[in-house]
């Protein structure tokens, strides 16, 4: 995926992990981001809250538990494509030192689908742009729709908005105004949002995509 700045910061912490590590991320949390990388022996976690505050931690696991020397204890429960990260109540204060104000890392993390990796997303975008520039608008819309169907739950809000705007324009140019409006419908809940409602971290990009969505909606009526 094309991550915004805060996601780029988040992912940078996991670059040093071994190639065999699995990558897990937050799901259905479009205003927050979280990344867990682990090979079962070591782990690295980075999260960014909706206000731009971070958690950053890592270490060695023993029986799927991490303990530092200062009372922090973290449990990892692996189940299929999901990892649940928890801390005992008695360890929460000690673990809070890894996070900024109101940031957290205890949550469910989901394995990122193959279609949603950065490489796959770049390939999908290239195919979309190639089809769009060739005026193959129906094909371009199909490519973008498939990507959204697979990856929407794992995308940051501004990514979702950008992808839906691209999809809407492709549908409009293909002559399918009904599908154009359907692509934008999930964004209409934000129609009345003001800049001050959102964090400085993504505010400018959010308002830019919101303005584009409103313009595209009117163009598809």
What do these predicted ranges mean?
Residues 117-154:
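Alpha-helical segment of the N-proximal tetratricopeptide repeat
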């Amino acid at each position: 995926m094309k991550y915004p700045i805060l996601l780029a910061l988040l992912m940078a912490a996991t670059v040093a992990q071994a190639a065999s590590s699995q990558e897990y991320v937050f799901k259905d949390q479009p205003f927050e981001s979280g990344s867990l990388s682990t090979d079962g022996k070591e782990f690295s976690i980075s999260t960014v809250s909706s206000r731009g505050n971070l958690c950053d931690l890592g270490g060695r696991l023993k029986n799927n538990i991490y303990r530092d020397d200062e009372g922090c204890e973290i449990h990892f429960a692996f189940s299929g494509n999901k990892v649940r990260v928890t801390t005992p109540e008695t360890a929460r204060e000690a673990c809070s030192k890894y996070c900024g104000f109101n940031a957290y890392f205890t949550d469910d993390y989901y394995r990122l689908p193959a279609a949603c990796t950065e490489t796959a997303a770049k390939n999908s975008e290239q195919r979309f742009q190639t089809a769009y520039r060739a005026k193959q608008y129906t094909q371009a819309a199909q490519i973008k729709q498939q990507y959204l169907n697979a990856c929407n739950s794992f995308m940051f809000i501004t990514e979702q908005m950008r992808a839906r705007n691209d999809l809407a324009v492709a549908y409009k140019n293909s002559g399918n105004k009904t599908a154009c409006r359907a692509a934008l419908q999930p964004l209409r809940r934000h129609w009345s949002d003001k800049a001050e409602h959102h964090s400085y971290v993504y505010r400018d990009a959010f308002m830019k995509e919101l303005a584009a969505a409103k313009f595209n909606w009117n163009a598809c009526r």
